[in-house]
Amino acid sequence: MSTVFPEDSVGLVVPQTARFDEPLALACGRSLASYELVYETYGTLNASASNAVLICHALSGHHHAAGYHAATDRKPGWWDSCIGPGKPIDTNRFFVVSLNNLGGCNGSTGPSSVNPATGKPYGADFPVLTVEDWVHSQVRLGERLGIQQWAAVVGGSLGGMQALQWTISYPERVRHCVDIASAPKLSAQNIAFNEVARQAILTDPEFHGGSFQDQGVIPKRGLMLARMVGHITYLSDDSMGEKFGRELKSDKLNYDFHSVEFQVESYLRYQGEEFSGRFDANTYLLMTKALDYFDPAATHGGDLAATLAHVTADYCIMSFTTDWRFSPARSREIVDALMAARKNVCYLEIDSPYGHDAFLIPTPRYMQGFSNYMNRIAI
């Protein structure tokens, strides 16, 4: 690509690392004596530190949400369509922070990191994490950057769950919550999909109980299958039909079980292959468990409105009509609970053919609604 970046891009960005040496107590009962978080920033923090926006990523996301790491990069960050000058999260107004979560595999301390107690990768010995644990770790990052209160915490899917948890755990630190394509907890069906994905990894002979790094291998097949299952749930039936239909890769059937015959088979195998080369299997297990465990209403006997009684943020909840992983009905559960708790909330349900992945795709109505809300935030 050209060395000149698009006018609405944040341009060249450099990841940074923050190290924390104060122990972090975790929900599982264990603690991390120290940890590192990799993050990027876009825009400029104003003198009163009142214009900061935190981006929380989804299951396979990371800190590189916008811009480019090099002039030769083929693609920008994963949410570049939403972050930059004149975009919904306008870097002419906001100072944006995007991080790789604790337990991740893109530089932050996680299963592939070296355990200082053993000198070997944590592997399966890395503690199980929850959404609350992530929020607690993110608070420290904000403080390190001089941010005591976020103008907004924003996220899609698992990122939206983090944004919601922020308003519950630290109500005084968040003015606005933008929760996109999310849910107040996983359904039994969603937990089931996660379990199938985990079993694909756990039963891969190359997993070695999570110590595959010590063996110099990766559970490639398990990761491929996990990603293939997950990817099906991110797309709608209509979008898969439109994109692939029943199209064949060649003009005839092979009448065997090993050939890649349909275009959709080729797509899924490509996605699985690509994912298995860049993602850590233990991190995948951790992320899916954090999803499964998320249930903030459990502290009040399942009453989400009671859980939200003390929150002070304003909320923007968005969903997409063809998202069956986290359907609009799940977003409306959050909206209904906020209304019952007499909180300020706006809700936008967007017609989109793209399923759960719609929160990553810049369709006009989505961009307009997102921009309209963010532009209302006083800084």
Curated annotation (Swiss-Prot):
Activity regulation comment: Requires MetW for activity.
Keyword Amino-acid biosynthesis: yes
Compartments, as annotated in UniProt: Cytoplasm
Residue numbers binding substrate: 227, 357
Domain AB hydrolase-1: 51-360
GO biological process: homoserine metabolic process; methionine biosynthetic process
EC numbers on record: 2.3.1.46
Site for Important for acyl-CoA specificity, residues: 325
Pathway: Amino-acid biosynthesis; L-methionine biosynthesis via de novo pathway; O-succinyl-L-homoserine from L-homoserine: step 1/1
Keyword annotations of the record: Acyltransferase, Amino-acid biosynthesis, Cytoplasm, Methionine biosynthesis, Transferase
A Gene Ontology term for the protein's cellular component: cytoplasm
Record bears the keyword Flavoprotein: no
Residues annotated as the enzyme's active site: 157 (nucleophile), 323, 356
Annotated catalysed reactions: L-homoserine + succinyl-CoA = O-succinyl-L-homoserine + CoA
GO molecular function, one term: homoserine O-succinyltransferase activity
InterPro entries, per database record: AB_hydrolase_1, AB_hydrolase_fold, HAT_MetX-like
Oligomer and partners: Homodimer.
Function, in words: Transfers a succinyl group from succinyl-CoA to L-homoserine, forming succinyl-L-homoserine.
UniProt record similarity statement: Belongs to the AB hydrolase superfamily. MetX family.
Protein name (database record): Homoserine O-succinyltransferase
Organism: Pseudomonas putida (strain ATCC 47054 / DSM 6125 / CFBP 8728 / NCIMB 11950 / KT2440)
